Amino acid sequence: MTVNGHHTNGVNGANGTNGHANGSNGINDTKAVKEIVPFVKPQVNFASAQRLEGCIHSLPELVDFNSLNNQHHTFCVQAKSSEPFDTITHGEFKVAVSKCAAWLKENLPIRPSSDDKALTKMAPVALFMESDIGLVIHEFALMSIGVPPLVLSPRLSPVAINALLEATGAASFIVSPRMSEPLKGALAALAAKGVSTHIGNPYKAYYQPGADPKSVAPFEVPQNPEDVILLLHSSGTTGLPKPIPTTHRQLLFAVNCHKFDTEEQAQSLNLSTLPLFHGFGLVAPGLSMSAGKPTLYPASDGIPNAKSIVDLINKTNAKSMMTVPFLLDDITNLPNEEGIKALVHMDFVGTGGAALGAGIGDRLAKGGVKLLNFYGTTETGPLSLTFAPTDNYDWKYFRLRTDCEYKIDELEPRDGERRFRLTVYPYGSEGFEISDQLIRNEQYPETDFAAVGRDDDVIVLATGEKANPLILETKLTEAPMVKAAIAFGENQFNLGVIVEPAEPLTPDTESAFRESIWPIITAACDQMDAFSRIPSPDAVVLVPAGVVIPRTDKGSIARKETYALFDKQIKGVYEQLLKAAADAVEPLDLDNLEQNLKSLIQEHLHIQAPASDWGVEDSLFDIGVDSLQVLQLRRILVTAASKTEAFKDTDCEKMIPPEFVYMNPSIREIAAALTKGSDGGDVSLEDAAKEVVELAETYSLKGVSAQEKAPSSSEGAFVMLTGATGSLGSHVAADLARRDNVAKVVCLVRKDKGTNQPPMPGGNPFDKKILKARGIQLTDEQFGKLATLEVDPTADKLGLIPMAYGMMQAKVTHVIHAAWPMNYLIRLRNFQYQFKFLRNLLEFASQGPAPTKKRFVFISSIATVARIGLAQPGSISEAPVSPSDSACGIGYADGKLVCEKIMEKAAQDYGGQLDVTSVRCGQMTGSKKTGVWNSNEQIPMLLKSAQGLGSLPQLSGELSWIPVDDAASTVSEIAFSDGSMPIVQHLENPIRQSWDAMLQSFGRELGLPAGKVPFGEWLDQVAAADGDDETFPVKKLTFFFKSFFQSVACGQVVLDTTVSRGQSKTLNAMTAVGDETVKAYADYWKSTGYLSK
């Protein structure tokens, strides 16, 4: 702690110490923090245009003040790729800025602006550097000598940089060593134009631990607070970035947007990932200078990602964070909620820029994270307050700061909501009207608002960048052949545009029209930011004849209504763009992988650095790859790997996760990780069993309950159903709706990202198309029993608001869990989403105020006992099995086994509240009533491949097929059976048939000869056949058909149904699948075009 100028080691920052970070030694060393030395608050004044006695009017003065009055308080901590980190005090920061200023004056042509109409008195110096303490030192060094820095975003194109340099009259250009490599050509071009170009020094050249600020002179005091001293930039109405001049007064306004209740809140470490080239990026160092809140900067030798940020939080015990929604989203979605756990202890987690999805925000808030909404504009600076929320503050709203004047005007209501306009007077009498329309929190009507739309309709892309489509829309509308144009792309990676022709088009004239407007689009895009450009003609939606773009009463295009009208076409655009990108990517060349990867990256990521300037061991981040390009690269790698023969049986999305490039940042590391991922290797049965046990223990309900509830009744049943869009689930929904004893069926639907669930259970009607597409007919009264409820399957309390969750618990009497992904290639650990879903459903069912037990039916699979059936002759009993006997190393089968174990544990520990059963299902076919059978299942795929080959395979053994509508009735009857349910039951047709007879029956319907070629040889013929996997769909699952199909489908595994037949009259009365049903299946596939007639 600081006492009379003396200091001790430590890095917390809250204690005013000077120690330098030794990784975890010091940053978390709370023993060293015995008391918090108050931070001497400076007397700043941004309201006055004239200098006042005793007041600070500029940031350089603030640096001097803190170097004398808060010398040993921590200014910032700069993290590095390896510890120890650098802790810089206010005294040391002052010395570093002074030394940097001396280097600037010695090496740069410091001169006044040559144009009388220039924005600044002195010619600016452009800074193109990483967002770390080095950039801060250079910024403040330039300001200290009266030279405005022009801070450039690393994402700017060369055209945009040139435009800003010309608009500001910049005399010099400083680039960091790391970012200089990709700009070699551009730097030479700038030098040729007379711009003095320099490679800047790293901050270590100026930072001197323990330096005495008294050893350097005070900075010269600026005489006019209205002088422009900083140039930021944004995208303006011209489409190119425009310079934003910022005065001394504006900067002081920006750094004073805080109100902390205690010194502990004010002085705790604040992690900032906000880019320093953005106006909000200066808030973090500003908090350090005005409130004593030290900033923690992530290491600058890579792009911050969710995992690295969480690791940094845990190492440093940072107590607050300022970040962007994109990164916060990734942090929230880290496995095992490690991101939320890292954030929950913080005083606040502030975010702004692009919108934070409601789903992510609600999830964080429910997890106890204190979210803070930032708001401001580039022109005004921050308008929201930075504080530690302690009241019932709602994160969806920002809280206005109260140290400046503003007025709120009410606008006309829109969409049933009151709307408001904010005008602020941040520094002087001149007001600035904000273009955003606002809504307000009626609990805090004077201070808490949320932005809901802009008058200028800027489109915020998925990256948080704001694209202004005015140039594009104007250029197109000015063309005589175009009546109207409106861009789209909110939360996407590219813009698209809807074009309404002046004259109606016919199918014959669409192509020519598209060709005629494309040069206009490309010319407009040449004047726009790179991220705002239309990527290809595929991103153009043409308004068909007879359709009119919606307009307001004033005649302007109604964007929201237009987007809704063309929602299907807009979605189609992005699907087509993804497909086009995928089509352009070739399979990986594993024999020459490193060079192949480099070529892929150079071609598709448009790396500025020439290929000759970087190698396979260089970090991609060192050659200028940014976070958006990381996303693009991951998509390219997944696509290329998916097309590669060696990976055909691999889930490439899982093999190459979102953090893959961050974890493997060089070509060599990517190649090694891919090669390692391809050898896979079989999982030993012992390891498979251990993994099943481990996952079952992890996801089982915790604790034991002795509470005993009364048995449930089947009358007036209120059923919660999952998987209602699938084959079995949709038939279960219909079967339940037809039953007189069922009052309601609520089908859980996975909530889309960023949407809100209805506040009351059963709030949304069931989509009738789901059932009608399967030929299922219900009366209006029966449809009325069906409803949907949007949930987040893995979120606490299913992501529902407490009222909805509680009411559902009170009403639901039965739960039928049928949702499950049909994929035999996914590894077991990739089913953890499903395990979390089951646990959440069991938690829901085992708790709540209902007086009776809930009956819970889990749909399992014959695959869980396939290993036992193959090893031992005879039927398998309806009883639990040991993982050591049944785990087989196949993710799908072992995943269902994990769930069975979770169900058994729930029955053991919560038997008083739950009556549970796992129903192992055998092979289900299509409906015997309608003939509808999903063409993406194994049997239809086999038959279509047989048509393509001209012959059926020879299959021996027996089959046990049950039509899906009979299976659905069986599930319902099990759920409503009398007495306690058996812990395990089997759902398989007890009547067995020969494969030979079944293939003969299908052969007659398809005109194919009986199978004479053994199945293995037949598969080889399919693999060698000249045709794609649309003609021969078995090719899509070659691994499954070769390895598992015969053992699973040909009667080697027999399920005993003695118990379940006692529970279900439908199952007890089952007959064989006859020729009429086979004909119905074949006729259905022919009617859809799947099979040839």
UniProtKB/Swiss-Prot annotation:
GO terms for molecular function: oxidoreductase activity; transferase activity. It comes from the Eukaryota. Signal peptide: none annotated. The keyword NADP applies. Residues 721-971 are annotated as: Thioester reductase (TR) domain. The keyword Oxidoreductase applies. Pfam families: AMP-binding, AMP-binding_C_3, NAD_binding_4. Its EC number is 2.3.1.-. Belongs to the NRP synthetase family. This is Non-canonical non-ribosomal peptide synthetase ascB. It comes from Acremonium egyptiacum. The lineage of its organism: Eukaryota, Fungi, Dikarya, Ascomycota, Pezizomycotina.
